[in-house]
Amino acid sequence: MSRQSFCLYLHGFLSSPLSKKAQQTIEFCNRSERRSQICVPEIKNGPVDTIKELRTIIDVHKGMDIMLIGSSLGGFYATFLSEEYDLPAVLINPAVRPFDARESLLGEHRNYYSDTIHSVTEDHLDELLQLERSPLMNPDNFWVLLQTGDEVLDYRLAVEKHGEKIA
């Protein structure tokens, strides 16, 4: 008998569980043959607090087949967690080095969905740097989906980190 599946979807910076990608993933998991459980937490804290919360979610579901899906900054977090827990991860236009985007990230930003204001500090960028995992210990755990026309993220950084694989 196979174990139940659990999917942890991590949205991007200033996004939400209400995003189109998150909602499509929820819909897919709910109607798939395996009827995977899915969790799409709202990521609204700094990096250290976010990782602490995500570790708790993973630890609660350890008896299940866990997979990660991360988009943008959620892809960065999924990379860290995949390496830490040796879990498969699908990354959608992942942020690869978000700590290098100091000028565009520092300061206050309005969430697209909730209108909540998020403040990004130097400490947050330093926390992101501490989460960097290179080189990857388990590169075969990743399936990376890239779009070349992303206005914010340079897909070439993801190709450099994860390699080019034709699937």
Describe the residue ranges of each PLM region:
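Short hydrophobic segments within beta-strands
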Residues: 9-13, 69, 145-147
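Aromatic pocket-lining residues of Rossmann-like dinucleotide-binding sites
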Residues: 81-85
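Gly/Ala-rich beta-loop-alpha elbow adjacent to hydrolase catalytic centers
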Residues: 68-78
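Short glycine-/acidic-enriched loop or helix-start segments at secondary-structure transitions
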Residues: 19-20, 77-80, 101, 154-156
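Active-site catalytic motif of lipid deacylating hydrolases and related acyltransferases
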Residues: 3-61
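Short, flexible hinge/linker loops that cap or flank conserved catalytic cores
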Residues: 1-2, 136
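The alpha/beta-hydrolase serine catalytic core
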Residues: 88-167
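Short acidic/histidine-rich motifs immediately flanking catalytic phosphotransfer sites
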Residues: 62-67
